[in-house]
Curated annotation (Swiss-Prot):
Residues 234-481 are annotated as: Hexokinase large subdomain. Fructose and glucose phosphorylating enzyme. Acts as a positive regulator of leaf senescence by mediating glucose accumulation and inducing an increase in reactive oxygen species (ROS). D-glucose binds at T199, K200, N234, D235, N261, E290, E321. Keywords: ATP-binding, Glycolysis, Kinase, Nucleotide-binding, Transferase. This is Hexokinase-1.
Length: 498
């Protein structure tokens, strides 16, 4: 996401300026007189709870702002919206009736996955997968070229296909492949997209500006592999496809894991930036929102969020993601505990490893948040093993759990506001379609799947914002492996029309 800017003078919009611009933001606290150390620590927690507050009125404003940003992002390419609202060119989702064998390639890190999925017209009859490590020399360095990288991937695909029996497949004909490519691309059709830049450990310079589908297709052809890339997608679109395969009422998909994103089904005529010649016969189009970049003055930001943002690799960007995703929740908690330790050193037994950025991970936060032992022994164990803080008192452990609860609750309720914002945008909240049929949101990611209190809080907040009557028609459900199964299903959905 490009850093937010004011068009007149290109002034960067920081988290601080967002908070100051919000009508519902609390005024700066007056300087407090000196207080005993324990009271000072308790004051840190009280101020955190106040700053992270997400009453229904504020969440409603966030949902409305989300819907407004979505509208702006659909209006014009490269406009004022922080949300990119990328047209995926997926205009047909799986129905559950697809048959045959389809393949998927999931490339997004130092390993890639290849899968074969056999569909039996009503379910997945068989799924076979393999994970392949990529040699470091193919990802960066002097020998890292597009031809070598995609050649290696194509060779692994050919080997995988050669070892598989064609049970109910394509009778030796051309095979269909869904390609999940988790790097920024400029997509121009369902099966083409030019690489904008690499992220993570990749630095294959000659691939930038290249059509990654064409590069893979050429490598497969050179190796005699009769396979066609039917769809180029990201994991969020794949999650939508996977959810749609099992439930025809799925209208949106959300990733809540290390990162976060959302995709949804839009009325194609509502996409003003789409040329009339590009309107699909189905009149629907899946939109990749890139909602992690969403920013609004009424997002409840704290001093800890602002410091994290300024010290990040992308200050002023990905505001929403830094508040709700698994990558950052542990780090926010760490920063709060570090301040508590500075105010009351005896409470947490000294700082230990608290000064080390990102040493506390969200799974650690979840484990402490869910601790129901009488003496909060799990909290004590985590503090000792992860942070080197020994001999904590029950009072200190309760304070740590409270901090975890505040940070996770804010994240869950803001995620709920985003979901409601999408439902508002497509008319599934007030009247119309929302009154007549179910609206299902498929969610993937470890934060939602494994952090029970986060999940329950988010679901409760969705019901709170919608109201009981509307909430009866909205379902939030888990949908796994969008990057693998979802890619194969999109390939199946698009090959059926070929």
């Amino acid at each position: 996401m490009a850093a937010a800017a004011v068009a007149a003078d290109q002034k960067v919009v920081t988290m601080t300026s967002l908070r100051e611009g919000c009508a519902c933001a609390a005024p700066p606290a007056a300087a407090a007189p000196p207080m005993p150390k324990m009271a000072a620590a308790q004051r840190v927690v009280a101020e955190l709870r106040e700053a992270c507050a997400t009453p229904a009125a504020r969440l409603a404003e966030v949902a409305a702002a989300m819907a407004g940003e979505m509208e702006a992002g659909l209006a014009v390419e490269g406009g004022s919206s922080e949300m990119k609202m990328i047209v995926s060119y997926v205009d047909s989702l799986p129905t559950g009736g697809e048959e045959g064998s389809y393949y998927a390639l999931d490339l997004g890190g130092t390993n890639f996955r290849v899968l074969r999925v056999r569909l039996a017209g009503g379910g997945v009859a068989e799924r076979v997968a393999r994970e392949v490590p990529i040699p470091p020399g193919l990802m960066s360095g002097g020998g890292a070229t597009s031809e070598c990288l995609f050649g290696f991937i194509a060779s692994a695909l050919a080997e995988f296909v050669g070892e598989e029996e064609e049970e109910g497949g394509l009778d030796g004909g051309e095979r269909e492949l869904g390609f999940t490519f988790s790097f920024p691309v400029h997509q121009t059709s369902i099966a083409s997209g030019t690489l904008i830049r690499w992220t993570k450990a990749f630095a294959v310079d000659d691939a930038i500006g290249e059509d990654v589908v064409a590069a893979l297709q050429a490598a497969m052809s050179e190796r005699g592999l009769d396979m066609r890339v039917s769809a180029l997608i990201n994991d969020t679109v794949g999650t939508l496809a996977a959810g749609s395969y099992y439930d025809e009422d799925v209208v949106a998909a959300v990733i809540l894991g290390t990162g976060t994103n959302a995709a949804y089904v839009e009325d194609a005529t509502a996409i003003a930036k789409l040329h009339p010649s590009q309107l699909p016969a189905s009149n629907t189009m899946v939109i990749n929102t890139e909602w992690g970049s969403f920013a609004s003055p009424c997002l409840p930001l704290t001093e800890f969020d602002e410091a994290l943002d300024q010290e990040s690799l992308n200050p002023g960007e990905q505001t929403y993601e830094k508040l709700i995703s698994g990558m950052y929740l542990g780090e926010i908690v760490r920063r709060v505990l570090l301040k508590i330790s500075s105010r009351c050193p005896s409470l947490l037994g000294g700082a230990g490893e608290l000064a080390t950025p990102f040493v506390l991970r969200t799974p650690d936060v979840s484990a402490m948040h869910h601790d129901e032992t009488p003496d909060l022994s799990i909290v004590g164990e985590k503090l000792e093993r992860t942070l080197g803080i020994r001999g904590t008192s029950p009072e200190a452990r309760r304070m740590v759990v409270e901090v975890c609860d505040i940070v996770a609750t804010r994240a869950a309720r803001l995620a709920a506001a985003g979901i409601v914002g999408i439902l508002k945008k497509i008319g599934r909240v007030d009247g119309g379609e929302g009154r007549r049929r179910r609206s299902v949101v498929a969610v993937d990611g470890g934060l939602f799947e494994h952090y029970g209190k986060f999940r329950r809080c988010m679901e409760s907040a969705v019901r709170e914002l919608l109201g009981e009557a509307a909430a009866e028609r909205v379902v939030v459900k888990l949908a796994s492996d969008g990057s693998g199964l979802g890619a194969a299903l999109v390939a199946a959905a698009h090959s059926q029309r070929a």
